[in-house]
Amino acid sequence: QELQANLPAERCCDVVICAPYPLIGALEAAGQCCALGVGAQDVSEHQHGAYTGEVSAEQLSDLGAQYCIVGHSERRSYHGETDLQVNAKTKILLENHIIPIICVGESLAQREHDLTETYVAYQVAAAFSGLTAEQAVRCVIAYEPLWAIGTGNTATSAQAQEVCASIRATLAKLYDANTAKAISILY
């Protein structure tokens, strides 16, 4: 009821909440009244098998998740998640009809050494490796600069726009301009 009361009936954008696993089902039920997208905060890179503690894309789909975050900076730094794992998770999510929200971003040192575009382009290319254009347009990219997480700092509008334009240029090189334009990029 609180969600419904606080979301405008007509919106110009999609609203998605990515919740911890135990809350996905309840959020999915609550979100039906107000066109709320429901997602998970992570997924296993493995489709099947005995991976204790892991939640598969198939399980997320059964819970009603429509989206899932992959490559979040906390997963990369605390759990050593690699670009190869982000790519594997992206592919598994797409196979299970879940929209991947692919996080990319640079550290403060990379920004200070003018490596932002190079590093972010590498992350994007790695995440989209092996994806067709049809698969790519089903993905969302979230620019998430590491230097802005939990620090109280935020990217300026100009900085965010510059990196988002660079991401779109990378996508155009990987695919084409129309495909790049069709992929949502968030900050």
Give the positions of each predicted feature.
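Active-site loop-to-helix "anion-binding N-cap" substructures in soluble metabolic enzymes
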Residues: Q1-Y187
